[in-house]
A protein has these predicted regions:
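Conserved hydrophobic beta-strands of the Rossmann-like cofactor-binding core
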Residues: 10-13, 93-97
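Canonical Rossmann dinucleotide-binding motif of NAD(H)/NADP(H)-dependent dehydrogenases/reductases
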Residues: 4-37
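Catalytic Tyr-X3-Lys loop
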Residues: 91, 111-130
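A glycine-rich helix->loop->beta "capping" turn
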Residues: 59-62, 82-95, 101, 114-117
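Conserved mid-core segment of classical short-chain dehydrogenase/reductases
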Residues: 77, 99-119
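The beta1-alpha1 cofactor-binding region of Rossmann-like NAD(H)/NADP(H)-dependent oxidoreductases
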Residues: 47, 67-80, 115
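Conserved Rossmann-like nucleotide-binding pocket used by diverse enzymes
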Residues: 2, 12, 36, 64-66, ...
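Conserved glycine-rich Rossmann-like NAD(P)H-binding loop of the short-chain dehydrogenase/reductase
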Residues: 31-51
Length: 130
């Protein structure tokens, strides 16, 4: 991709306060996109949506931090209504959010994990983007 190839494009990256989501958001910013940074981690600190938005801005894009719990349908609707109100469209959607179970249930036999773990993952990973 060329520099500023995404200038004028509007993106949302779910779960972008850290890790892969942060990397994707910054990469979109490097190409000039306006990127809605979503997550539950708002405020000061290295692993927050505010810090990711700052990184997107420094990369040449426009970072917009939005605190949203993707397990809450009303918060999801407010996010997309805000994007529509601000821009009238959404060009790029990256569904990256993931909920780490508390307590973590890594390893073992998947069929022995509580069904709530599955429901949470489907709710955040699939349903929230719908």
């Amino acid at each position: 991709m060329k520099e500023n190839e995404l200038k004028g494009k509007v993106a949302v990256v779910t779960g972008s306060s850290r890790g892969i989501g942060r990397g994707i958001a910054v990469g979109l910013g490097e190409k000039g996109a306006t990127v809605y940074i979503t997550g539950r981690s708002k405020g000061n600190g290295p692993l927050t949506i505010d810090e990711t938005a700052k990184m997107v801005n420094e990369a040449g894009g426009v970072g917009v931090p939005v605190s949203v719990d993707l397990g809450d349908d009303e918060q999801i609707m407010r996010l997309y209504q805000q994007i529509e109100s601000d821009h009238g469209r959404l060009d790029i959607h990256v569904n990256n959010a993931f909920k780490i179970p508390n307590p973590p249930v890594w390893g073992g036999k998947f069929w022995e994990h509580p069904i709530q773990v599955w429901d949470d993952q489907v709710g955040i990973g699939l349903r929230a983007a719908y």
